[in-house]
């Protein structure tokens, strides 16, 4: 990964005479002596390749020429005995490509000296907060502390500068996403081989998560969804405690994370190895929408336009089944979007002003139908790479037709 190039691109987007301060974050306390698994700020990882707590990146465009400094946590031998080694200065230099690496204890003084001695016009922090989050974000907190300490300095948001770069993947990023998809494929095939009536949803989940870890994934990309029967109609069901019954379907929405990048795949399998005629009829409508979106995706399109195309196909199929009378009623059975960007985040970052797809974008293709009265929930999700004149289905090798799935589950 060319982290240096990314930092240079962000510096180019920053205002003249500004600096950016980006923190990796801190561990979140859960209870007693328990901490949540640490997740580094995604933009920090994107610009450094590092995913450890208590680090900071400073991009200094007020200097001439511009400077880049990385601050890392100093090792404590006693704490390392309990929790493992910290990243060394040499390791941080090698991973990030940054030559000026200092310890975090020097950061406050370095910032203060910069603000006192030089004419800094603006300071960037990553002040983005997801609308669904009510937890304090560490970078937002640090931005507030800075604003209180230096009230005359303009605080700006770094997030859109990094997000505008993250929307388009380079060849190295595409290769890692392909690797994550390959691991996901292997694990899904293991799930299919073991799937049978009477097993618990969490056993299908366990088969998947065991196999991705065995094949080099760091973690699941997100909490695995393994919903059988009526549970397949619940979009983000992840309790995964019910019994898989013969004659029912199981919807598996899952993915592997490899080197910080994610796959996001959904397949819907017959628990007993065979789809019923009704299930197959609904499945083929969803499959037709999936294939149509993959065919239509290209530079210049938007995810909203792809969703309109998806809804047209789904509505036509539902009317043929007699479930709806007019196409506008498709939202009774399909209530989400067909595509989102994919990368370091599963629902990867976007910038509203850059809604049109360009070569290098990786998006999902995930039509679905959720029919409560039939206890049928079907979603088929693939990952697409937007190319110069169309889209490449990165997950094409993960089988999806009813005939392929039935044959595989029968051992053929």
Model-based region annotation:
Residues 1-412:
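Active-site neighborhoods and metal-handling regions in enzymes and metal-associated proteins
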């Amino acid at each position: 990964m060319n982290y240096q190039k990314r930092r240079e691109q962000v510096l180019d987007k920053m205002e003249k005479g500004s600096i950016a301060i980006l923190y990796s974050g801190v561990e979140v306390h859960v209870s007693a002596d328990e901490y949540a698994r640490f997740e580094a700020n995604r933009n920090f990882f994107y610009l450094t390749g590092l995913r450890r707590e208590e680090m900071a990146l400073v991009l200094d465009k007020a200097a001439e020429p511009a400077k880049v400094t990385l601050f890392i946590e100093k090792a404590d031998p006693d704490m390392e005995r309990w929790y493992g080694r910290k990243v060394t200065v040499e390791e941080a230099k090698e991973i990030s490509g940054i030559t000026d690496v200092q310890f975090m204890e020097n950061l406050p003084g370095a910032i203060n000296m910069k603000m006192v001695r030089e004419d800094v016009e603006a300071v960037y922090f990553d002040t983005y907060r997801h609308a669904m989050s009510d937890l304090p974000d560490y970078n937002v907190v640090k931005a507030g502390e800075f604003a209180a300490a230096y009230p005359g300095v303009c605080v700006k948001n770094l997030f859109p500068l990094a997000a505008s770069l993250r929307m388009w993947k380079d060849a190295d990023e595409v290769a890692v996403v392909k690797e994550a998809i390959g691991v996901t494929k292997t694990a899904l095939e293991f799930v299919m081989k073991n799937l049978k009536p009477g097993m618990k949803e969490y056993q299908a989940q366990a088969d998947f998560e065991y196999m991705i870890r065995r094949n080099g994934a760091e973690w699941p990309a997100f909490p695995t969804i393994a919903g059988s029967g009526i549970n397949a109609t619940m979009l983000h069901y992840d309790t995964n405690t019910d019994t898989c019954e013969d004659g029912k379907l199981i919807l598996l929405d899952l993915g592997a994370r490899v080197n910080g990048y994610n796959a996001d795949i959904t397949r819907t399998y017959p628990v007993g190895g065979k789809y019923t005629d009704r299930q197959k009829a609904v499945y083929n409508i969803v499959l037709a929408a999936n294939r149509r979106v993959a065919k239509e995706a290209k530079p210049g399109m938007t995810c909203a336009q792809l969703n309109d195309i998806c809804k047209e196909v789904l509505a036509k199929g539902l009317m043929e089944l007699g479930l709806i009378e007019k196409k506008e009623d498709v939202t009774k059975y399909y209530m989400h979007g067909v595509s989102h960007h994919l990368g370091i985040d599963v629902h990867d970052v976007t910038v509203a002003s850059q809604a049109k797809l360009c070569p290098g974008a990786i998006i999902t293709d995930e039509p679905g139908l959720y029919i409560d009265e039939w206890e049928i929930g079907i979603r088929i999700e693939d990952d697409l790479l937007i190319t110069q004149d169309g889209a490449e289905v990165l997950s094409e090798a993960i089988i999806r037709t009813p005939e392929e799935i039935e044959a595989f589950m029968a051992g053929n």
